[in-house]
Swiss-Prot record:
Catalytic reaction equation(s): N-acetyl-D-glucosamine + ATP = N-acetyl-D-glucosamine 6-phosphate + ADP + H(+)
Pathway: Cell wall biogenesis; peptidoglycan recycling
Protein name: N-acetyl-D-glucosamine kinase
GO molecular function: ATP binding; N-acetylglucosamine kinase activity; zinc ion binding
Assigned EC number: 2.7.1.59
Organism, as annotated: Yersinia pseudotuberculosis serotype O:1b (strain IP 31758)
BP GO annotations: N-acetylglucosamine metabolic process; peptidoglycan turnover
Lineage: Bacteria, Pseudomonadati, Pseudomonadota, Gammaproteobacteria, Enterobacterales
Gene: nagK
Residues noted as binding ATP in the record, renumbered to the chain: 4-11, 133-140
Amino acid sequence: MYYGFDMGGTKIELGVFDENLQRIWHKRVPTPREDYPQLLQILRDLTEEADTYCGVQGSVGIGIPGLPNADDGTVFTANVPSAMGQPLQADLSRLIQREVRIDNDANCFALSEAWDPEFRTYPTVLGLILGTGVGGGLIVNGSIVSGRNHITGEFGHFRLPVDALDILGADIPHVPCGCGHRGCIENYISGRGFEWMYSHFYQHTLPATDIIAHYAAGEPKAVAHVERFMDVLAVCLGNLLTMLDPHLVVVGGGLSNFEKIYQELPKRLPAHLLRVARLPRIEKARYGDSGGVRGAAFLHLAEK
């Protein structure tokens, strides 16, 4: 059995998956804000409850909105203060008497999609999240590529490519990023960036859902904005594809629901790839909100 915890700022969700990778049980509880011992006790209690339900001890994986230290498993996650700076992996492993694996929730998203029955046929899978920010994960032969510092999937912190400046104008502001740098692509091609660019060019603020609705109705500003956004997205993704050369790209996050992306990217990407490059398959994520739990559960499966 495979147990996956999706640990967020407000809730902890546990999903239990059988040997056929089907979810057979799940439970949600609130996340303690500040109390680390309470957090450990909740995770222990949920694990033991799952063991009782299954009649066996399952493997345990945890997805967090942050980064585990690559050397000692210490957790860095501002969204879960009770776990921030704590040796969660070592402490919980000791409490439940089995190895616990922890990874970034974006990597868990990518792993979940890569283990889809159809997608498993692809040797390299790029999970790309276009949500409040931009991130994701790279899966090679069913396993996460984390990198030395566990930041392989931090795609949103690439700087805006020079070709994007041709589209947006050389005077486009280099927006300050939460990472401490300026001009990171997540400030332009995320859902938040989608709204910011509209506001920048038209001095009018609208939520992404309204912009897309205006686009569907043929409103000229919204149409021009979407065209510009798709061009910038193609430039940024083209750079990423040239570097990683995946067989499959799976798109998640709020903007993944904008179907125009899957129509436009295949037409616009070739101009930004090497001539010998073949386009990867580009698909919308299949597992939605359950992807984090699935991917966390499969952190052990990926090592088999």
